[in-house]
Amino acid sequence: MKIIDCTTYYSEDLMLDVRFNILNDYVSKFIVVESKYSHSGKIKPLNFNINNFPKFKDKIQYMVIENEPQGIIPNNDNSASIKRMNSLLRIEQSYNFILNGLHDVSDNDLICLSDNDEIPNFESKDFKNSKNDIFIFKQLFFYYKFNLFYDLIPWYGTK
């Protein structure tokens, strides 16, 4: 069984480096997807540089989304609800795009999908002997920064 870790990227090198270091002993491959568009639809430069992660270079598969998703709604009135809907379409596109990197997986491989700051704890579960097909990780909730730990609610992140 292989574990493939899939995430999207904007410009969070520090968080991605933390993620790679924590998961490296468990993961066979890291899939990193970056879009040429921000969630708000603005064209942005590509920020990912594989040379910033030399220790993990052989495990990283980097993929770029070149185009906007289908179904973007023109927003001439600057409507907040249309902005949100279009943002969700872009997020959905980035998660779906990860499928393009999963051509060499088998039925018993574990594919994990989460944002960079949602880092699963693989020490806590014996995946090889589990009968479950889907796992949802209960994770620690840090509110955007490591010094902002919030312990009043559980965070169910990586799936």
Task: For the regions a language model picked out, list residue spans one by one.
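Active-site-proximal specificity loops/subdomain of glycosyltransferases
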Residues: 37-113, 122-123
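Surface-exposed, flexible loop/turn segments at secondary-structure boundaries
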Residues: 11-13, 38, 68-70, 142-143
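Conserved catalytic core of nucleotide-sugar-dependent glycosyltransferases
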Residues: 118-159
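Conserved beta-strand scaffold positions in the cores of enzyme catalytic domains, especially
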Residues: 30, 62-64, 134-136
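Short His-Asn-centered micro-motif
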Residues: 5-11, 33-34, 113-116, 137-140
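Short loop->beta transition adjacent to catalytic acidic/histidine clusters or analogous donor-positioning motifs
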Residues: 3, 23-38, 56-61
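N-proximal low-complexity "stem/linker" segments adjacent to membrane-targeting elements
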Residues: 1-25
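Short, well-ordered alpha-helix to beta-strand connector turns
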Residues: 27, 57, 108, 131-132
